């Protein structure tokens, strides 16, 4: 339910704004999002500041499969990044702000505005409206239709994923059950062998 609610609210969520302090040994700050196979992803970035202001801001965009979509070194201002996801996966937008000790001070930082759009949100609806000569109400209905299709596809993906996990769980349970039966058989056989061995040993010593 929460996932569905986020999908419905996604078109109304404003861009993410934050400050990233410059450090001599910076750690990457990453924002993670998820995308389905074949979906268009558009990332818009805007920063304040200027080159040589003591901040060396770097950007890395990559997914969990190891694909890298963009790498920017010492950038400032507006940047637009677009790519089509080769598979259903998560991707990270990572920032790294290094302090230039020769030009900056310990309070150096960059204000960053980040907006990530995917699927129907990432499409150029103005161009589509002009090309297909859609009226405003038709354009809104088209947006709703595509968003609904995306929600249905996402729900189907979650359903299929749940089925795969259930099958894996059932297979694991079956292997554990078979292993438990095998252990019981081995322990029973070992116990019987020990009893027989002790019986023969005591007989040989004329104890019994």
Swiss-Prot record:
Membrane topology type: Single-pass type I membrane protein
Annotated localization: Endoplasmic reticulum membrane; Golgi apparatus membrane
One annotated GO biological process: protein transport
Membrane-traversing stretches: 178-198
Topological region Lumenal: 16-177
Main location: endoplasmic reticulum
A Pfam match: EMP24_GP25L
Keyword entries, A-Z: Endoplasmic reticulum, ER-Golgi transport, Golgi apparatus, Membrane, Protein transport, Signal, Transmembrane, Transmembrane helix, Transport
The keyword tRNA-binding belongs to this UniProt entry's keyword annotation: no
InterPro entries, sorted: Emp24-like, GOLD_dom
Keyword Transmembrane helix: yes
Location of the GOLD domain: 28-118
Cytoplasmic side: 199-208
A GO CC term assigned to this protein in UniProt: Golgi membrane
Signal sequence range: 1-15
Protein task: Constituent of COPII-coated endoplasmic reticulum-derived transport vesicles. Required for efficient transport of a subset of secretory proteins to the Golgi. Facilitates retrograde transport from the Golgi to the endoplasmic reticulum.
Similarity comment: Belongs to the EMP24/GP25L family.
PANTHER family in UniProt: TRANSMEMBRANE EMP24 DOMAIN-CONTAINING PROTEIN
Name of the protein described by the UniProt record: Endoplasmic reticulum vesicle protein 25
Gene that encodes it: ERV25
């Amino acid at each position: 339910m929460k996932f569905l609610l986020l999908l419905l609210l996604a078109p109304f969520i404003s861009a993410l704004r934050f400050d990233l302090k410059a450090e001599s040994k910076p750690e990457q700050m990453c924002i993670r999002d998820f995308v389905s196979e074949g979906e268009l992803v558009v990332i818009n970035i805007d920063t304040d500041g200027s080159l040589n202001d003591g901040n060396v801001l770097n950007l890395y965009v990559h997914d969990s499969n190891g694909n890298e979509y963009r790498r920017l070194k010492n950038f400032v201002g507006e940047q637009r990044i677009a790519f089509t996801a080769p598979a259903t996966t998560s991707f990270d937008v990572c920032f790294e702000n290094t302090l230039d000790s020769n030009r900056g001070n310990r309070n150096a930082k960059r204000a960053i505005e980040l907006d990530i759009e995917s699927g129907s949100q990432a499409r150029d609806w103005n161009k589509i409206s002009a090309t297909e000569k859609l009226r405003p109400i038709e354009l809104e209905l088209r947006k709703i239709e595509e968003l609904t299709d995306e929600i249905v596809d996402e729900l189907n993906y979650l359903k299929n994923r749940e089925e795969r996990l259930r099958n894996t769980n059932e297979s694991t349970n079956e292997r554990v059950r078979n292993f438990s039966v095998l252990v019981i058989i081995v322990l029973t056989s070992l116990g019987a062998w020990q009893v027989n061995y002790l019986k023969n040993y005591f007989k040989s010593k004329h104890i019994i």
